[in-house]
């Protein structure tokens, strides 16, 4: 086992503090509408340019083990805020730095670290309550666009596109962000349920120009197992021909004789038909087939439920207004399922989302909700160069997360003012002893740090701006760093999601409290440079 280097109290805290400040100083230059870029070297290809706090934080690794521990703890703040709210990572880093620096001074002055932490926790909970109370619901798509614009560093086009996408797919819809090949940033909305399985044979194509199979008002047969023979389906197929409608077959696979029969039938101009594989795998496939059945008002033909293909009747099939199939994906538009059943299915999946601990499962469940309840929108981010596209994609991701957070918990005044106003909730708050009161005072001072940093990044004195806002009785009065004007921030469109502000403060004070109460640090001792390899033992008596 390698030797360890151990540091105690002041020696430990000072080294850790250096690491905290190194990381936070690199991250905080990105804060606000006039925040600067950070250029990150890559081992291959062009360097990455970003204004995303968590991206900068994740790249930082310090040589000194003790300094690196401090940096990694603050990196944890940014990562946690990013996971919970998707934005506000720079704000949480700035808050953590401010609380840690003030807290370390108090510890050096002889105060009890545990009481300081209790005071910090007490103050944080009070300010969080104030932020929740001050939040108001998002009224319209213009406010959604404003939130997106602020988070995308003032790029109104990004805010508008996100607002339009959310309006089209609803608050439950899935919006994904991809890189575009061209210069333009564009939004594509897919209505209805789409899954990534295409037609099993190109002979099913009805539109040769687009190479798509389009079925108008079709019946939909949903089968859990493979179809290798159509013999059991003959009575059903005769009923469908009499009804004069097309048929879509969704099954685990359609193979051999069954597929050949369907293709020959289509080429001879008999039944208009197409077949696709079922989406997903294993248990997820069963769940997705059930989703399709509920959406289209049909039933999953499953042997587990004692159903046989021979006994399937036309009323067990689903229907939809239209089905469009390409070689890669199938889209079911306007399924004929009962709204009450679809709503019940959505709430059932939402319960699973709340209970799951896996990020992957949560993402897949959210996709299923979107396909049932709303739709799917894709924002394709364009730019002149690959570096620019990646930088813009970071900002679009942030803006998208911020708008989702705004819809969930409402909005508060932006520009760091919500935290300064939240500090008023600490007036008259007393801890159990003077050291706890010092912890409360630390939070009060730290709450101004994001506002000051936004002003400093805009080239304005942060102390002057903070002083003016403290003196104002108007809760929405603040400094618009983009235009360098004072006034009502709501009317300027400078707004933040309450969830982002709340999460940033909670995560920052949590990790800062741990850093302040650190008394010893243990790290692996670096191996001495040029250390000689151990000599061979004396083998005695060898020739």
From Swiss-Prot:
Cellular component terms (Gene Ontology): cytoplasm
Domain of life: Bacteria
Localization, UniProt: Cytoplasm
Main localization, broad class: cytoplasm
EC number: 5.6.1.7
Enzyme class: isomerase
Binding positions (ATP): 30-33, 51, 87-91, 415, 496
SUPFAM superfamilies named among the record's database cross-references: GroEL apical domain-like, GroEL equatorial domain-like, GroEL-intermediate domain like
Xref: Pfam families: Cpn60_TCP1
UniProt entry tagged with the keyword Ribosomal protein: no
Alphabetical list of PROSITE patterns matching this protein: CHAPERONINS_CPN60
UniProt GO MF annotations: ATP binding; ATP-dependent protein folding chaperone; isomerase activity; unfolded protein binding
GO biological process: protein refolding
UniProt keyword list: ATP-binding, Chaperone, Cytoplasm, Isomerase, Nucleotide-binding
Reaction catalysed by this enzyme: ATP + H2O + a folded polypeptide = ADP + phosphate + an unfolded polypeptide
Family: Belongs to the chaperonin (HSP60) family.
HAMAP family: CH60
PANTHER family: 60 KDA HEAT SHOCK PROTEIN, MITOCHONDRIAL
Known partners and oligomeric status: Forms a cylinder of 14 subunits composed of two heptameric rings stacked back-to-back. Interacts with the co-chaperonin GroES.
Function: Together with its co-chaperonin GroES, plays an essential role in assisting protein folding. The GroEL-GroES system forms a nano-cage that allows encapsulation of the non-native substrate proteins and provides a physical environment optimized to promote and accelerate protein folding.
UniProt protein name: Chaperonin GroEL 1
Organism listed in the record: Roseobacter denitrificans (strain ATCC 33942 / OCh 114) (Erythrobacter sp. (strain OCh 114))
Originating gene: groEL1
């Amino acid at each position: 086992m390698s030797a360890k280097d151990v540091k105690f109290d002041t020696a430990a805290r000072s080294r850790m503090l250096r690491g905290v400040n190194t990381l936070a100083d690199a991250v905080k230059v990105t804060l606000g509408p006039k925040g600067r870029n950070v250029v990150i070297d890559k081992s291959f290809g062009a360097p990455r340019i970003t204004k995303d706090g968590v991206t900068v934080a994740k790249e930082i690794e310090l040589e000194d083990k003790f300094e690196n521990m401090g940096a990694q703890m603050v990196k944890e703040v940014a990562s946690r805020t990013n996971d919970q709210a998707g934005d506000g990572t720079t704000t949480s880093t700035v808050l953590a730095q401010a609380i840690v620096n003030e807290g370390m001074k108090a510890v050096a002055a002889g105060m009890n670290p545990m009481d300081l932490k209790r005071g910090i926790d007490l103050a944080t909970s009070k300010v969080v309550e104030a932020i929740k109370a001050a939040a108001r619901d998002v009224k319209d798509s213009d406010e959604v666009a404003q939130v997106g614009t602020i988070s995308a560093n003032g790029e109104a086009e990004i805010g508008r596109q996100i607002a339009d996408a959310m309006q089209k797919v609803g608050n439950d819809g899935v919006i994904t962000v991809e890189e575009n090949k061209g210069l333009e940033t564009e939004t594509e909305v897919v209505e209805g349920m789409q899954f990534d399985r295409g037609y099993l044979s190109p002979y099913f194509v009805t539109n040769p120009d687009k190479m798509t199979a389009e079925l108008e008002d079709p019946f939909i047969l949903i089968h859990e197992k493979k179809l290798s023979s159509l013999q059991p389906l003959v009575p059903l197929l005769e009923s469908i021909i009499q009804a004069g409608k097309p048929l879509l077959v969704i099954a685990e696979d359609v193979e051999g004789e069954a597929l050949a029969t369907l293709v020959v039938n289509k080429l001879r101009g008999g039944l208009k038909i197409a077949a696709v594989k079922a989406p997903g795998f294993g248990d997820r496939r069963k769940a997705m087939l059930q989703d399709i059945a509920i959406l289209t008002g049909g039933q999953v033909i499953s042997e587990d439920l004692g159903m046989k293909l021979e006994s399937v009747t036309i009323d067990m099939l689903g229907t939809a207004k239209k089905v469009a199939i390409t070689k890669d994906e199938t889209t079911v538009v306007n399924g004929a399922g009962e709204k009450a059943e679809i709503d019940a299915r959505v709430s059932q999946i939402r319960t699973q989302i709340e209970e799951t601990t896996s990020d992957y499962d949560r993402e897949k469940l959210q996709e299923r909700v979107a396909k049932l309840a709303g739709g799917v929108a894709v924002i394709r981010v364009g730019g002149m160069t690959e570096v620019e596209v990646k930088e813009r994609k970071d900002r679009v991701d942030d803006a998208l997360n911020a708008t989702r957070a705004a819809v969930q918990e409402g909005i508060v005044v932006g520009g760091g003012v919500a935290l300064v106003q939240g500090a008023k909730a600490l007036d008259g708050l007393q801890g159990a002893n003077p050291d706890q009161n010092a912890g409360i005072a630390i939070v009060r001072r730290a709450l101004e740090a994001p506002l000051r940093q936004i002003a400093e990044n805009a080239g304005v004195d942060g102390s002057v701006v903070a002083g003016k806002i403290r003196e104002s009785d108007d809760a929405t009065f603040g400094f618009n760093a983009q235009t360098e004007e004072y006034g009502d921030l709501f009317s300027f469109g400078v707004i933040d999601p309450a969830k982002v502000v709340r999460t940033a403060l909670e995560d920052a004070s949590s990790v800062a409290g741990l850093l302040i109460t650190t008394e010893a640090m243990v790290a692996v001792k670096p191996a001495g440079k040029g250390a000689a390899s151990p000599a061979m033992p004396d083998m005695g008596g060898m020739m």
